[in-house]
Curated annotation (Swiss-Prot):
Quaternary data: Part of the ribosomal stalk of the 50S ribosomal subunit. The N-terminus interacts with L11 and the large rRNA to form the base of the stalk. The C-terminus forms an elongated spine to which L12 dimers bind in a sequential fashion forming a multimeric L10(L12)X complex.
Pfam families reported in the protein's UniProt record: Ribosomal_L10
Keywords linked to the UniProt accession: Ribonucleoprotein, Ribosomal protein, RNA-binding, rRNA-binding
Name the record gives this protein: Large ribosomal subunit protein uL10
One GO biological process term: translation
GO annotations of cellular component type: large ribosomal subunit
Disulphide bonds in the chain: none
Alphabetized Gene3D superfamilies for the sequence: 3.30.70.1730, 6.10.250.290
Function field: Forms part of the ribosomal stalk, playing a central role in the interaction of the ribosome with GTP-bound translation factors.
GO MF annotations in UniProt: large ribosomal subunit rRNA binding; structural constituent of ribosome
Claim: Transmembrane helix is one of the keywords in the record: no
């Protein structure tokens, strides 16, 4: 690879590192082409970009970004996954794959919102419900007091109408 190609790759990686909400590093030593293709397809479905890059290029590209703390992990074969939207989805796919392919694929570290997280933190992130489920729970929590208040307001006239109806039935019976 000539110098111009390397500079272009560094610039491209730098832009992706700056844009990504979360970046995950993994060691893919011993992975077969079939396994790599499966992982790429699963990550693509989760809107995650997956690349294999030279460690020296990653080192240069991560300078002056909030992902610079990953530098000590640029050793051995390094794959990098960029999540631009939902870091939880990326963590789920990568953690699941790391469990099923424990001999050939190991997570190294990640950066989420500018803070480095460990492999155990990645697993904890993967155990979270999806963004949609969390939003639904939040909306349910916000909506519950309003729904209860409406129920209380509707109960007062309802009980009054039932009381009047009971009086009417009682008078008709006499």
């Amino acid at each position: 690879m000539n110098r111009e190609n390397k500079q272009q790759q560094v610039a491209e990686l730098h832009e992706k590192l700056k844009r990504a909400k979360a970046v995950f590093l993994a060691d893919f030593r011993g992975m077969s082409v079939e396994q790599a293709t499966t992982l790429r397809n699963e990550l693509r479905a989760a809107a995650v970009e997956y690349k294999v890059a030279k460690n020296t290029l990653l080192e240069l590209a991560s300078k002056e970004t909030d992902k610079e703390s990953l530098s000590p992990h640029y050793a051995g074969p390094t794959a990098i996954a960029f999540s631009y939207d939902d870091p939880v989805a990326a963590a789920k796919v990568l953690s699941k794959f790391a469990k099923t392919q424990a001999n050939t694929f190991k997570l190294k570290a990640a950066v989420l919102s500018g803070k480095q997280i460990s492999v155990s933190d990645i697993q904890a992130l993967a155990d979270l419900p999806s963004r949609e489920v969390l939003l639904a729970k939040l909306l349910g929590t916000i909506n519950a007091p309003v729904a209860n208040f409406v129920g209380v307001l509707a109960a007062v006239p309802g009980s009054f109408v039932r009381a009047l109806n009971a009086i009417k039935i009682q008078k008709e019976g006499n």
